[in-house]
Swiss-Prot record:
This is Small ribosomal subunit protein bS16. InterPro entries: Ribosomal_bS16, Ribosomal_bS16_dom_sf. One of its GO terms (biological process) is translation. Coiled coil: none annotated. It comes from Chloroflexus aggregans (strain MD-66 / DSM 9485).
Length: 89
C-alpha cells in the first residue's frame, strides 16, 4: 500500500519534515517514491508548502495519507472537512 506521510529531516531538536509518498513497508526515513512538499514546525509562523497537483494525483490513485498529513492537507485546502479531495480551483 502506498502512503503519504512525513519524513523527518533536520538537526537534533530542530525537526523539519518532507511530505513524501512511500510504500507503507519502508522505514519512516527510508526509501520513498516522490517528495510532494515540506513542513517546518519550528519556524514562526509555521511553514507548510505542498505541490497540490501531485498531492491530488496520489490521492486519486489510492495513496492513503496518515492522520497528521490529513490535518496538513486540510490546512492548505486539498482535503475538505470530511477528508474528500477538493476540486482544483
Amino acid at each position: 500500500m502506498v502512503k503519504i506521510r512525513l519524513r523527518r529531516t533536520g538537526k537534533t531538536k530542530q525537526p523539519s519534515y518532507r511530505i513524501v509518498v512511500a510504500d507503507s513497508r519502508s522505514p519512516r526515513d527510508g526509501k520513498f517514491i516522490e517528495t510532494i512538499g515540506y513542513y517546518l514546525p519550528t519556524r514562526q509562523p509555521k511553514v507548510l508548502e505542498v505541490n497540490a497537483d501531485r498531492a491530488r494525483y496520489w490521492l486519486g490513485v489510492g495513496a492513503q495519507p496518515t492522520d497528521v498529513v490529513v490535518k496538513l492537507l486540510k490546512r492548505v485546502n486539498i482535503l475538505d472537512e470530511q477528508g474528500k479531495v477538493v476540486a482544483e480551483s
